[in-house]
A protein has these predicted regions:
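Extracytosolic ligand-binding ectodomains
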Residues: 2-8, 13, 20-387
């Protein structure tokens, strides 16, 4: 199977470049798009996924005047710099990539190039870089709107202590939540549980329960007996000082937080629980600690259709962010078709919403804000919330 994929990839690379040269010799006006993707190294699989997605977009647009110039970004800045120099020499101004923001400083030196990156690490505008990733600011804006709709008044925002802590806090401030408490936690599960116990006043609520049980024990009053039987089904007694929780985490980190919340007797029936974008990760469908929670994300129907089409052609499921590469091709083509020429990143700053596979988004001052939907994880299914 791997041999088949290698043949397909090699064919795409040859096809891209063969048709480019053929059209250039005719002197036709073509849309030249560079693709700066990791085609070697640890992220090689992601780079190949992106290239296949670009090919799908070309097929759907069906305009022979669009030509792709793939170059390997590898994993070292020297390789990226070399590729960018080649793009400049070949007069290729619009580049899909890179996939992350690690070497953005180096890209700033190539002012003649426009980079449409798949990174989501920042939504701050850059002179020659537009980041199309599902950024945290877009997620928080959708979450804020949802919290307001649900009429929640006291929110706790939880996020891990790591290299992205300052980035998270900066975005939270920019969205301007009201009546919100910020709470950073340790990735160590033992420390995390103690932190959540403190946040939820777990020990005091446990004491409240035991005290009430002792008070009712021995009473022969029917109402006391009924209350006692109900209390014996509980783990704590008393309310917490918040009505909603936002967890900026994913994967095992998110699962650890959900487990700690369940352990401290925080129920989704009483507290609105929201997480960051989960990309419809199937593994969270098996989550048993807290079964119902909400998260912002892209259009689920389009996401499923894209993955199904990708699987139908390439016989495997792509990385979740692959759909962004497809949308980027469509975006570049839309701008080129309407503007006739793309000279700088400013050409992408449109006053109207743009609709892609991921859903609607807007670009202004080189900044991308996605209009994300809210989904609920309920009984092992992803359900779109009606706003």
């Amino acid at each position: 199977m791997k041999k088949i994929f290698k043949i397909i990839l090699s064919y795409l690379l040859i096809t891209f470049n063969t048709f480019v040269f053929a059209v250039e010799n005719k002197g036709e006006n073509i849309l030249k798009i560079g693709a700066l993707l990791p085609l070697t190294g640890e992220l090689k699989g992601l780079g190949e996924d992106m290239l296949y997605a670009i090919n799908l977009a070309l097929h759907d647009i069906d305009n022979p005047k669009i030509k792709i110039y793939p170059k390997d970004s590898g994993s070292k800045k020297e390789k990226i710099i070399e590729a960018c120099k080649e793009f400049s020499k070949e007069d290729i101004k619009i580049i899909i990539g890179p996939t992350d923001s690690e070497f953005f400083k180096e890209l700033h030196n190539f002012e003649d190039l426009i980079f449409i990156s798949l990174s989501n690490i920042n939504s701050d505008p850059k002179k020659n870089i537009i980041m199309m990733g599902i950024n945290l600011e877009s997620q928080l804006l959708a979450i804020k709107k949802f919290i307001q709709k649900e009429k929640k008044k006291k929110t706790v925002i939880l996020y891990p202590k790591n290299e992205y802590t300052k980035h998270v806090e900066k975005n939270i401030r920019s969205v301007n939540f009201t009546n919100t408490k910020l709470f950073s936690y340790s990735k160590d599960s033992k420390i995390l549980t103690k932190q959540i116990e403190k946040l939820t006043s777990y020990k005091q609520r446990k004491i409240n329960l035991n005290s009430r049980v002792k008070k009712l024990e021995g009473s022969e009053e029917p109402k006391d007996i009924r209350e006692l039987n109900q209390l014996k089904q509980r783990y704590t007694l008393g309310k917490v000082n918040f009505d909603s929780v936002v967890i900026i985490d994913f994967g095992n980190g998110l699962k650890s937080v959900l487990t700690s919340l369940a352990y401290t007797d925080i129920s989704e029936k009483d507290i609105l629980i929201i997480t960051g974008n989960q990309w419809f990760d199937d593994s969270i469908l098996k989550e048993t600690s807290i079964k119902n929670f909400y998260f912002p994300s892209i259009d689920l129907k389009n996401f499923k259709k894209f993955n199904e089409k990708f699987y139908e052609i390439y016989n495997y499921k792509p990385n979740e962010i692959t759909i962004l590469a497809y949308d980027i091709v469509g975006l570049i083509y839309y701008i080129w078709k309407n503007e006739k020429n793309i000279n700088s990143a400013n050409n992408f700053n449109l006053k109207t919403d743009i609709k892609g596979k991921v859903g609607k988004f807007k670009i202004f001052d080189n900044k991308v804000i996605q209009k994300l939907n809210i989904y609920k994880l309920e009984e092992g299914k992803f359900i779109k919330n009606k706003l």
